[in-house]
Structures are given as structure tokens and as C-alpha cells.
Amino acid sequence: HLEDITRADFYGFVVPFVNELMKMSAQAKIPVRIRACDTMGYGVPYPEVALPRSVPGIIYGLQHYSDVPSEMLEWHGHNDFYKAVANASTAWLYGASAVNCSLLGIGERTGNIPLEAMVMEYASLRGSLDGMDTTVITEIAEYFKKEMGYKIPPMTPFVGKNFNVTKAGIHADGLLKDEEIYNIFDTEKILNRPASVSVGKTSGLAGIAYW
């Protein structure tokens, strides 16, 4: 558990420390999983940025300078700079086999990596759900709201009440003509959430017609 790795001395401390861990792992014949922790959400997903902030640099460095196998490398992120999902996806793409998540991103301070976001990210990257029933995401959100009294911010992607709900008349007009125009994927099939409208001062005739 490499705490606060995005503010650590990567070459002076992290690499030598992990090298010793890997030696002990080999001697004891016990696999050691290395978790790179962006404890303060300070990491960035850009390969050009200097270590220790660069997530690509961290994942690459642990694999190539400390010989950590991809299958034993995971990422743990926070969302202080709105980069939890971007950093987690980058960690995957650069070789980490796993990312730590929490339901609805609930966690310390501004939260952790939302599990539902990474499920959708996985599907986007792989082009397949690989058997996952993603309608459970909606069921989980409803459980949190009804049984636990948890208030999900309305604008939260995939689970907020405003997700795939339009208030704009021009969008409603597009939905009337072809749902694909303003619904980025089949939200009813994937999340059991059909596209809908909220009628208000910006709805126009099309919004009322769709409603």
C-alpha cells in the first residue's frame, strides 16, 4: 500500500522500497500486490508530466524499474481534482490490472473512484460488458436513496436523477425524431433508465409532446 505516491520521492524512495519488497516476495515465494495510492487526488493522467504526479509514469516505473507484474499492480485514487476516473482509466491503460472503487464514489473528502463509472469505462474500453448486468447500477442507486437515505447529487452520471433527462425543447424534439440523437447509448437496456424529459420553462412544444 504505497500511500501518497503522487507526492513521494519516486526514484529515491518508492523504487528502492518496492525493489526490496519484490526481493522478499521472491525469496518467500509469496506474491505481493502493490497498490499505488493517490491519497490526495494529486495525480494527473498525462505522460508528459514529471513524476511523481504522472499516473502513466508511476505505473510504467513500477513495472519497469521494480519489476512489478501487471497482474499484481493496482491503483487507488481520490477525486480532489475531479480526476479520479481519468486517473483510474489511465492506470488501466498503462498496465495496472485493477483499480479500487466504491459504490457511488463514496469515500474520504471528495470521494473515491465510483464503481459504476469504471463499469461503464470498462465497457467502453473493451467494447463488451463481458456478462455484467449493468441494470444493477440503477438498483444500487435506488437502494442507497430509499433504504439508506443517501442523497445522490442530481447531476451525477449514470445514477443521478437528471441523467438522460432533458429540459431543453430542442433536445426533446430530437428525441421525438430519433432517440439516438440525444441519448448516447441505450440507457433503457444498459441501466433500465429510458430517456425522459422534465417539463419547464425551456421545454417548448416538443418537450410537452415528448412528456
Language model: regions and residue ranges:
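Structural signal for hydrophobic packing residues in well-ordered secondary-structure cores
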Residues: 18-26, 59-67, 96, 119-127, ...
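Catalytic cores of large soluble enzymes that bind and process phosphate-bearing ligands
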Residues: 6-10, 46-50, 54, 79, ...
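Short glycine/serine/threonine-rich phosphate/pyrophosphate-binding segments
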Residues: 81-86
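C-terminal helical cap(s) of enzyme catalytic domains, especially alpha/beta-barrels
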Residues: 107-137
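A mid-to-C-terminal "edge-of-domain" accessory segment
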Residues: 128-211
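Alpha/beta enzyme core
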Residues: 1-71, 89-96
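Glycine-rich phosphate-binding active-site loops on the catalytic face of alpha/beta enzymes
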Residues: 93-114
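Generic beta-strand/beta-sheet core signal
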Residues: 1-3, 37, 74-78, 99-104, ...
